[in-house]
């Protein structure tokens, strides 16, 4: 949530600030001042992250007959703990888990998060709410820039670099984009520079606008929550197209590790190839 303030500055300082305004990465004087203050305060990453862990994991059966996706093992720890490791690498320790299916097991295992070096709160879904609905429920906890991550993927992303792009672009949402050889199985990003114009769903390989796909990792501003309809809602279908039309949706291509563990075949591939967060 942004508030209007009035500043009185030396004219020479203002000249230096204005010299950095280019209309692209730095939109205007207000934007330039915000970036300078963030840098001075060391606010180089969001302070809070949401992990979406409410799904049933039907494609991971029989494993998920007994345990939720959030607790499936990867290299001696749960899938979710690898996300904790990524966040802690950037000193992000205020984490919210959106839980639904088998939520009691998840909450019993992670409790308040102190055993894992984090502070953990929960958004409880009494019915499936999709990838966007839980954010509506957690609105009161999400009052400044925040991260959202799917809970069934392993990823290694430079969050500091991504956040810098997000702020410089004056984005309402920035999507981390990963590269795949065959984009025909995914929604593929069409971009103009860093701005996402649209996602083309499962194009023929030769007709794909790029090889960049949604990695299930986002940085958002609280204003995004006001665009989410009540009840079941998907970021991909109900929110991102609105942001793209507004010109406020951006993409951050990254080359780090990314594994989707959403089915047995992909999970087994991740077990073999994933390198733990250092």
Model-derived features: where do they sit?
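Conserved N-terminal catalytic core of the sugar/cofactor nucleotidyltransferase
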Residues: 2-4, 11-15, 19-27, 31-51, ...
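Generic preference for hydrophobic
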Residues: 71, 122-123, 199, 251
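A structural signal for short hydrophobic beta-strand segments in well-ordered beta-sheet cores
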Residues: 71, 188-191, 240, 251
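Residue-level signal for inorganic ion chemistry
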Residues: 80, 106, 138, 152, ...
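Conserved beta-strand termini and adjacent loop/short-helix elements that scaffold enzyme active sites
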Residues: 123-125, 176, 252-254
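A short, conserved acidic/glycine-rich loop-to-beta-strand motif
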Residues: 169-179
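Catalytic-core segments of class I nucleotidyltransferases/pyrophosphorylases
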Residues: 26-27, 146-147, 154, 160-167, ...
């Amino acid at each position: 949530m942004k508030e209007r303030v009035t500043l009185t500055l030396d004219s020479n300082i203002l000249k230096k600030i204005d010299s950095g305004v280019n209309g692209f990465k730095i939109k205007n004087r207000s934007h330039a001042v915000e970036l300078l203050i963030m840098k001075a305060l060391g606010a180089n990453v969001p302070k809070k992250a949401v992990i979406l862990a409410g799904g049933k994991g039907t494609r991971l059966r029989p494993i998920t007959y007994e345990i939720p996706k959030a607790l499936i093992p990867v290299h001696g720890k749960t899938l979710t703990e690898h996300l904790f490791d990524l966040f802690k690498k950037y000193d992000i320790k205020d984490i919210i888990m959106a839980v639904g299916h088998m939520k009691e097991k998840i909450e019993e295992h992670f409790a308040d998060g102190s055993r894992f070096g984090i502070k953990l709160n929960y958004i409880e879904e009494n019915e499936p709410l999709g990838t966007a609905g839980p954010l509506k429920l957690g609105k009161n906890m999400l009052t400044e820039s925040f991260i959202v991550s799917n809970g069934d993927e392993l990823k290694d992303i430079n969050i500091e670099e991504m956040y810098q792009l997000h702020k410089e672009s004056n984005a309402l949402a920035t999507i981390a984009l990963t590269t795949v050889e065959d984009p025909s199985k995914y929604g593929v990003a069409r971009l103009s520079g860093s701005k996402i114009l649209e996602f083309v769903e499962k194009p023929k390989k030769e007709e794909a606008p790029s090889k960049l796909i949604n990695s299930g990792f986002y940085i958002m501003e609280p204003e995004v929550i006001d665009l989410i309809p009540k009840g079941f809602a998907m970021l991909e279908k109900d929110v991102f197209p609105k942001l793209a039309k507004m010109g406020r949706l951006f993409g951050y291509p990254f080359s780090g590790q990314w594994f989707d563990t959403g089915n047995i075949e992909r999970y087994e591939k991740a077990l073999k190839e994933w390198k733990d967060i250092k």
